[in-house]
Amino acid sequence: DKGLFRIEYTDEFYCDYLACVKLLMINNTGGNATELIGIVSRGKFLRSIDMPEFDSFKGNLEQKLEPVLLIEIENCFKKEAYKIVVALCESLFYIDPINDEALCYAIQSLTKMNMVNEAKVQYLKFSVEYMNTMNTEYPYSFTDIQKKV
């Protein structure tokens, strides 16, 4: 249509971006953590598309998604839904690989599920990413993080 793309959105058509936006428009996920995990656990939206035209589009979605994920993480942690917390934290790491709050909740949740070795692995992966990004060591020890939330 005049040199532009046009996609007709019908009931048979599923778009994870639109489903995610719909959840975000509710202002929170309304307890739809499982649906949100299913969408964002695949990684960044349009990650394989390297076109500057989409950069602000992707950035805006991530900016809206991050606080919603943090709220869901906190809510699920209070409900002791630790597996969901870990999955949400992993999803948040796609957006912000050095999100300190997500690390704390992931470590706490894994520890509460008696998965201390997995928690240590998570901490080490985070520390490496932090060093690569910030060019300095992560300032908190594993023990500090276990006590932080």
Model-derived regions, located:
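Intrinsically disordered, charged and Pro/Gly-enriched terminal/linker segments
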Residues: K2-V149
